[in-house]
C-alpha cells in the first residue's frame, strides 16, 4: 500500500506567503522558498503553492518563483492559481514545477486537462475541486446531483469559491478522471477554515468512485482530524495550511503519531 502523504499548502500573494507564520530560525519569514525548504527538512512529502492573487486579479503566474523553488527544495511541489491555458501550465512545468493544479480553467475549458496529460503525462496534472453543500431545491440542480441525506448535494464552485456552477462533485470528479487528470484535490468549502475536521464521508465516497489519488483539503484542526480523513475517509493525502504555519502541529510529531496508530507514512 502506498504511503499516505502530508502536504503543507502555501498561499502566495505578491511573492509572499500570506497566512501567518510563527516559526523561529527562518531567515526570511514568509518567503515561499524559505518556507518550502523548512517544510522539506521537517519531512513534508510534497508542497502545494497557490498564487491566490492570480485568479481574481488576472496576474500572470509566478514563473520566476517556481524556478527558485525548484532550485532549492528536493521534494515534489505543485503550483496553481490563475492557470487558464495550456501555455500557462507548460510555462510552470518547464520552470521546474513537478505538477500543476487547475480549477476554474478545468470547468470552462476541460480540454486543457487532456492536452496537458497528453503532452506531459497524467501524473503532472492535478484538478482542484472546490465544492459546498447546497440544499436541494434552492438552486437549479444538476441532473446528476446525488443528494446527501435526501436534502442536499455537493455543488462545484469556481473563481476561488465565489461562483457556483451546474456541476456536482462526484460526477465532475469522474469526468476529470476520464479526461486524464492524475490526481484530484478536493476542498470542502463547508469545512475550510473551521478546524473542525474534514468532510470525511465525501472523501470516502470519492475513494469508492475513483481510481486516482485524492488529496483532502479543508478543515484540519488536529492530528485526529488528519488521521480520520486518511483512514475513515481513505484519502491518499492530507493537505493543511494554518495548523502547520502557526506551529500548532509539527510534521515530525504528526507523522510519528500516525505511524504509531498504524497509518503508513514516510518518516
Show the residue positions of the predicted features.
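Structural preference for beta-strand elements that scaffold enzyme active sites
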Residues: 5-9, 46, 74-78, 99-101, ...
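Conserved, mostly hydrophobic/aromatic
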Residues: 11, 39, 47, 79, ...
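Conserved anion-binding
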Residues: 12-14, 18, 98-186, 190-191
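Short, acidic/polar
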Residues: 28-40, 84-90, 165-175, 226
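Glycine-rich, proline-tolerant flexible connector loops at the mouths of alpha/beta enzymes
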Residues: 46-64, 104, 185-196
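Alpha-helix-loop-beta-strand connector modules within alpha/beta enzyme cores
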Residues: 58-80, 115-130, 195-216, 220-221, ...
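Catalytic cores of alpha/beta
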Residues: 77-78, 83-96, 100, 201-238
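C-terminal helical cap(s) of enzyme catalytic domains, especially alpha/beta-barrels
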Residues: 113-120, 230-240, 244-267
Amino acid at each position: 500500500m502506498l504511503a499516505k502523504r502530508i502536504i503543507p499548502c502555501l498561499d502566495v500573494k505578491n511573492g509572499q506567503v500570506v497566512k501567518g507564520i510563527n516559526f523561529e530560525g527562518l531567515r526570511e519569514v514568509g518567503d515561499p522558498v524559505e518556507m518550502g525548504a523548512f517544510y522539506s527538512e521537517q519531512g513534508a512529502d510534497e508542497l502545494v503553492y497557490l498564487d491566490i492573487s492570480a485568479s481574481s486579479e488576472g496576474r500572470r503566474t509566478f514563473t520566476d518563483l517556481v524556478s527558485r523553488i525548484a532550485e532549492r527544495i528536493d521534494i515534489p511541489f505543485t503550483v496553481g492559481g490563475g492557470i487558464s491555458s495550456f501555455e500557462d501550465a507548460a510555462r510552470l512545468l518547464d520552470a521546474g514545477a513537478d505538477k500543476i493544479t487547475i480549477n476554474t480553467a478545468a470547468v470552462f475549458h476541460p480540454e486543457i486537462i487532456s492536452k496537458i496529460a497528453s503532452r506531459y503525462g497524467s501524473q503532472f496534472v492535478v484538478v482542484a475541486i472546490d465544492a459546498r453543500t447546497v440544499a436541494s431545491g434552492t438552486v437549479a440542480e444538476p441532473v446528476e446531483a446525488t443528494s446527501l441525506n435526501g436534502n442536499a448535494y455537493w455543488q462545484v464552485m469556481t473563481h476561488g469559491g465565489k461562483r457556483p456552477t451546474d456541476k456536482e462533485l462526484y460526477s465532475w470528479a469522474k469526468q476529470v478522471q476520464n479526461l486524464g487528470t492524475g490526481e484530484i484535490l478536493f476542498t470542502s468549502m463547508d469545512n475550510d477554515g473551521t478546524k473542525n475536521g474534514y468532510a470525511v464521508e465525501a472523501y470516502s465516497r470519492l475513494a469508492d468512485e475513483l481510481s486516482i489519488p485524492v488529496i483532502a483539503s479543508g478543515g484540519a484542526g488536529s492530528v485526529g482530524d488528519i488521521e480520520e480523513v486518511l483512514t475513515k475517509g481513505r484519502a491518499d493525502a492530507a493537505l493543511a495550511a494554518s495548523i502547520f504555519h502557526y506551529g500548532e502541529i509539527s510534521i515530525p510529531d504528526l507523522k510519528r503519531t500516525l505511524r504509531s496508530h498504524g497509518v503508513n507514512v514516510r518518516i
